[in-house]
Regions:
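Alpha-helical transmembrane segments of multi-pass membrane proteins, especially transporters
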Residues: 27, 51-59, 75-83, 102, ...
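Small-residue-rich segments of transmembrane alpha-helices in multi-pass membrane proteins
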Residues: 28, 59-61, 108-117, 184-186
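Structural signal for alpha-helical transmembrane segments and their membrane-water exit/capping regions
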Residues: 1-16, 44, 117-121, 160-167
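Transmembrane alpha-helical segments of multi-pass membrane transport proteins and ion-pumping complexes
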Residues: 31, 35, 84-92, 118-119, ...
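Helix-loop-helix "hairpin" substructures at the membrane interface of multi-pass membrane proteins
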Residues: 71, 75-79, 85-90, 142-205
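Transmembrane helix-bundle core of multi-pass membrane transporters
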Residues: 100-165, 192-195
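Single transmembrane alpha-helix segments in multi-pass membrane proteins
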Residues: 3-10, 16-68, 93-98
Length: 205
């Protein structure tokens, strides 16, 4: 995409434009980060629309923990645990009530997760972390390149290899192609779906 834009838009690769692109990169990389496990859900032929609410609830509770003076590692663990629990809730409902469409289930959990966040904050409330030193660390840069770019690239390669080359990945494709056939082939359909939705929640955290 960068090469194509550079061909058709003269001056795109000028220094000031590239510097601005690098400055804004962390915002977009956060979305790319969530797309990595979402790819697995899409391969299943499903969708999870509760990711925004999961991020919201995880951020709310982790910020509250941060404002109590908890160590940064505890703040991070809080976010990861909350996200994982939200993902596990989605996975549990979808695997126990397989007749329910994923879009409807995750729409419902989206409302629930966001509602919990609003109850915690109060109507129209907001919250911010009082101690941002730890967040500055993970949001740091190597030169002008943000750390998260390297994390996203590493995770993208790992998840792509797992999906394309591993037995687990082939099973995910089999479930997405025909869930019933995959089940009668001996694939643990419920287990795999539960794992994928739980991992999605962890990434949201």
């Amino acid at each position: 995409l960068f090469i194509l834009v550079n061909i058709f838009c003269k001056g795109f690769s000028e220094y000031y434009n590239l510097e601005n692109l690098l400055r804004q990169m962390p915002v977009y990389l956060a979305e790319v980060f969530l797309m990595i496990p979402m790819a697995y859900i899409l391969v299943l032929g499903e969708i999870d629309i509760s990711v925004g609410a999961t991020v919201c609830l995880s951020a709310t509770l982790s910020c509250m923990m941060c404002n109590t003076g908890a160590p940064f590692i505890v703040v991070i663990l809080t976010a990861l645990i909350v996200g994982t629990v939200c993902g596990a809730v989605n996975g549990f409902i979808l695997t126990q009530f397989e007749e329910l469409p994923p879009m409807i289930v995750t729409l419902a959990t989206q409302i629930i997760f966001r509602g919990i966040a609003e109850i915690v904050l109060g109507s129209g409330g907001s919250i911010s972390a009082s101690n941002t030193d730890g967040f500055r660390l993970i949001g740091g840069k190597v030169g002008k390149i943000p750390y998260i770019l390297f994390l996203v690239l590493i995770l993208a390669v790992i998840f792509a290899v797992i999906l394309g080359k591993s037995t687990f990945g082939r099973r995910v494709y089999a479930i997405g192609t025909n869930r019933l056939t995959a089940y009668y082939s001996g694939i643990h359909v419920k287990k795999i779906r539960f794992i994928i939705y739980t991992v999605m929640g962890t990434f949201c955290g």
